[in-house]
A protein has these predicted regions:
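Short glycine-rich, basic-tinged beta-strand/loop micro-motifs
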Residues: 22-40, 65-68
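N-terminal acidic leader/helix
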Residues: 1-30
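Acidic-enriched, low-complexity/disordered segments with a strong bias for Aspartate over Glutamate
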Residues: 7, 18, 28, 38-41, ...
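Detector for the mature cores of small, proteolytically processed
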Residues: 40-71
Length: 71
């Protein structure tokens, strides 16, 4: 798991909100960045995976599809 800069967090939140009208919640943990969604949505999940893949990172979601971290 890894951390990302706050600028990148804001860019992700803006991109998801502009595209889907929902909020991504950011959780700054001591060792890494974590994120959550209010409800699972396969379209948003795919968007986030692709978004980070383009930046050379990998978003890993939990089984419920509501939380993810980066690798």
């Amino acid at each position: 798991m890894k951390s990302i800069s706050f600028d990148k967090v804001l860019a992700l939140k803006q991109a998801v909100h502009d595209t889907f009208g929902v909020n991504v919640h950011f959780h700054d943990l001591c060792s890494h960045s974590a994120f959550s969604l209010d409800e699972p949505d396969e379209r948003i999940r795919a968007f986030i995976i692709d978004y980070f893949k383009k930046q050379g990172d990998r978003a890993v979601f939990n089984a419920a599809g509501t939380e993810f971290t980066l690798e």
